[in-house]
Amino acid sequence: MLLFTFFACGTDPDESSASKSNELLQPVTPSERLFTHEDVDGTGFKTAKEYDVEGLTGATDVLFGFWRPDGSEAKEYEIRFYPSHDVAVESGTAFADEATGDDAILDKDEATWKEGIKDRRYFFAGPIGTHGSGGVKAKYGGYVIYGNMIMLCEGANAAHSLDRCGALLAAMGADPLE
Protein backbone atom coordinates (compact mmCIF):
# COMPACT_ATOMS: atom_id res chain seq x y z
CA MET A 1 0.00 0.00 0.00
CA LEU A 2 2.83 2.39 0.82
CA LEU A 3 4.46 1.71 -2.57
CA PHE A 4 1.22 2.57 -4.35
CA THR A 5 0.96 5.81 -2.39
CA PHE A 6 4.49 6.77 -3.38
CA PHE A 7 3.78 6.35 -7.08
CA ALA A 8 0.38 7.97 -6.84
CA CYS A 9 1.98 11.07 -5.36
CA GLY A 10 4.74 11.18 -7.96
CA THR A 11 5.31 13.94 -10.43
CA ASP A 12 2.53 15.34 -12.49
CA PRO A 13 3.30 14.80 -16.20
CA ASP A 14 2.22 18.38 -16.88
CA GLU A 15 4.97 19.63 -14.56
CA SER A 16 7.83 18.43 -16.75
CA SER A 17 10.89 20.60 -17.15
CA ALA A 18 9.91 21.15 -20.78
CA SER A 19 6.56 22.66 -19.89
CA LYS A 20 8.20 24.79 -17.19
CA SER A 21 10.62 26.20 -19.76
CA ASN A 22 7.65 26.95 -22.02
CA GLU A 23 6.25 29.15 -19.27
CA LEU A 24 9.37 31.33 -19.45
CA LEU A 25 10.09 31.39 -23.18
CA GLN A 26 7.56 33.27 -25.24
CA PRO A 27 7.20 32.77 -29.00
CA VAL A 28 8.27 36.40 -29.52
CA THR A 29 10.87 37.80 -27.11
CA PRO A 30 12.64 41.12 -27.63
CA SER A 31 16.33 41.30 -26.75
CA GLU A 32 18.93 44.02 -27.20
CA ARG A 33 21.55 41.36 -27.89
CA LEU A 34 22.37 40.87 -31.56
CA PHE A 35 23.05 37.20 -32.21
CA THR A 36 25.43 36.01 -34.91
CA HIS A 37 26.45 32.83 -36.66
CA GLU A 38 29.27 32.54 -34.10
CA ASP A 39 26.82 32.43 -31.17
CA VAL A 40 25.16 29.39 -32.73
CA ASP A 41 28.47 27.72 -33.61
CA GLY A 42 29.59 28.03 -29.97
CA THR A 43 26.89 25.56 -28.88
CA GLY A 44 28.16 22.66 -30.97
CA PHE A 45 25.50 23.33 -33.62
CA LYS A 46 26.49 21.68 -36.89
CA THR A 47 25.74 23.84 -39.91
CA ALA A 48 24.79 21.68 -42.88
CA LYS A 49 23.90 24.54 -45.24
CA GLU A 50 23.84 28.30 -45.45
CA TYR A 51 20.92 29.48 -47.55
CA ASP A 52 20.85 32.34 -50.02
CA VAL A 53 18.68 35.03 -48.40
CA GLU A 54 17.49 36.52 -51.69
CA GLY A 55 13.72 36.77 -51.44
CA LEU A 56 13.66 36.45 -47.63
CA THR A 57 12.86 40.07 -46.85
CA GLY A 58 15.19 41.68 -44.32
CA ALA A 59 17.24 38.56 -43.51
CA THR A 60 21.03 38.80 -43.41
CA ASP A 61 21.95 35.12 -42.95
CA VAL A 62 20.18 31.74 -42.71
CA LEU A 63 21.65 28.52 -41.32
CA PHE A 64 20.25 25.00 -41.59
CA GLY A 65 21.73 22.31 -39.42
CA PHE A 66 21.36 20.14 -36.36
CA TRP A 67 22.10 20.17 -32.66
CA ARG A 68 21.88 17.56 -29.92
CA PRO A 69 20.05 18.96 -26.88
CA ASP A 70 21.54 17.46 -23.70
CA GLY A 71 23.08 14.55 -25.59
CA SER A 72 19.74 13.40 -26.97
CA GLU A 73 18.94 12.60 -30.58
CA ALA A 74 19.97 15.34 -33.03
CA LYS A 75 17.23 17.81 -33.97
CA GLU A 76 17.17 20.05 -37.02
CA TYR A 77 16.92 23.82 -36.98
CA GLU A 78 16.68 26.66 -39.46
CA ILE A 79 18.00 29.88 -37.96
CA ARG A 80 17.34 33.19 -39.68
CA PHE A 81 19.25 36.32 -38.70
CA TYR A 82 18.01 39.89 -39.10
CA PRO A 83 19.59 43.29 -38.35
CA SER A 84 17.29 43.82 -35.32
CA HIS A 85 14.38 42.38 -33.39
CA ASP A 86 11.98 44.82 -35.03
CA VAL A 87 13.05 43.78 -38.53
CA ALA A 88 12.77 40.09 -37.58
CA VAL A 89 9.20 40.59 -36.36
CA GLU A 90 8.06 42.92 -39.13
CA SER A 91 9.74 41.18 -42.07
CA GLY A 92 10.14 37.58 -40.93
CA THR A 93 6.93 36.56 -39.18
CA ALA A 94 4.91 35.83 -42.32
CA PHE A 95 7.76 33.74 -43.78
CA ALA A 96 8.08 31.76 -40.52
CA ASP A 97 4.32 31.18 -40.34
CA GLU A 98 4.38 29.88 -43.89
CA ALA A 99 7.17 27.38 -43.13
CA THR A 100 5.86 25.87 -39.87
CA GLY A 101 2.96 23.98 -38.36
CA ASP A 102 0.10 22.00 -39.81
CA ASP A 103 -0.68 24.71 -42.38
CA ALA A 104 2.90 25.04 -43.64
CA ILE A 105 3.32 25.63 -47.36
CA LEU A 106 5.74 22.92 -48.42
CA ASP A 107 5.26 23.01 -52.19
CA LYS A 108 7.94 24.95 -54.06
CA ASP A 109 5.36 26.26 -56.53
CA GLU A 110 3.30 27.81 -53.73
CA ALA A 111 5.94 28.94 -51.21
CA THR A 112 6.92 32.60 -51.01
CA TRP A 113 10.58 31.82 -50.19
CA LYS A 114 11.68 28.65 -51.96
CA GLU A 115 15.27 28.30 -50.70
CA GLY A 116 15.64 25.25 -48.43
CA ILE A 117 12.04 24.12 -48.80
CA LYS A 118 13.08 20.46 -49.18
CA ASP A 119 14.78 20.67 -45.78
CA ARG A 120 11.57 21.91 -44.13
CA ARG A 121 9.52 18.80 -44.81
CA TYR A 122 9.31 15.16 -43.80
CA PHE A 123 8.13 12.42 -46.10
CA PHE A 124 6.37 9.53 -44.46
CA ALA A 125 5.20 6.22 -45.87
CA GLY A 126 1.67 4.90 -45.73
CA PRO A 127 0.77 2.29 -43.11
CA ILE A 128 2.47 -1.09 -43.46
CA GLY A 129 0.34 -3.56 -45.38
CA THR A 130 -1.62 -0.89 -47.22
CA HIS A 131 -1.21 0.64 -50.61
CA GLY A 132 -1.17 4.14 -49.13
CA SER A 133 1.43 6.42 -50.59
CA GLY A 134 2.11 8.42 -47.41
CA GLY A 135 2.53 12.14 -47.49
CA VAL A 136 4.47 15.25 -46.56
CA LYS A 137 4.49 17.03 -43.21
CA ALA A 138 6.26 20.12 -41.88
CA LYS A 139 9.49 19.34 -40.02
CA TYR A 140 9.06 22.44 -37.88
CA GLY A 141 5.98 22.53 -35.66
CA GLY A 142 6.68 26.12 -34.69
CA TYR A 143 9.23 28.86 -34.25
CA VAL A 144 10.59 31.45 -31.86
CA ILE A 145 11.53 35.04 -32.59
CA TYR A 146 14.22 35.89 -30.06
CA GLY A 147 16.07 39.15 -30.47
CA ASN A 148 17.24 39.39 -34.07
CA MET A 149 16.76 35.66 -34.79
CA ILE A 150 13.91 33.56 -36.00
CA MET A 151 14.50 29.92 -35.09
CA LEU A 152 12.45 27.20 -36.77
CA CYS A 153 12.89 24.15 -34.57
CA GLU A 154 12.08 20.52 -35.30
CA GLY A 155 9.01 19.30 -33.48
CA ALA A 156 5.71 17.50 -33.96
CA ASN A 157 3.84 20.60 -32.78
CA ALA A 158 4.43 24.15 -31.57
CA ALA A 159 5.07 23.07 -27.95
CA HIS A 160 7.78 20.56 -28.96
CA SER A 161 9.39 23.17 -31.19
CA LEU A 162 9.29 25.78 -28.43
CA ASP A 163 11.07 23.36 -26.07
CA ARG A 164 13.80 22.67 -28.61
CA CYS A 165 14.23 26.32 -29.50
CA GLY A 166 14.46 27.10 -25.77
CA ALA A 167 17.17 24.49 -25.24
CA LEU A 168 19.32 25.91 -28.05
CA LEU A 169 18.76 29.48 -26.87
CA ALA A 170 19.83 28.48 -23.35
CA ALA A 171 23.00 26.90 -24.77
CA MET A 172 23.66 30.24 -26.50
CA GLY A 173 23.42 32.04 -23.16
CA ALA A 174 20.10 33.69 -23.96
CA ASP A 175 17.90 34.66 -21.03
CA PRO A 176 14.16 34.41 -21.74
CA LEU A 177 13.48 36.92 -18.96
CA GLU A 178 15.79 39.70 -20.21
Question: Model-predicted segments: where are they?
Answer:
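Second-shell loop/turn segments in exported
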Residues: 22-27, 75-81, 149-158
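A short, solvent-exposed beta-edge/loop patch
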Residues: 111-178
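C-terminal motif of bacterial Sec signal peptides marking the signal peptidase cleavage site
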Residues: 5-8
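Short, solvent-exposed recognition patches
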Residues: 37, 41-131, 135-136
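N-terminal "mature-domain start" segment
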Residues: 10-68, 159-178
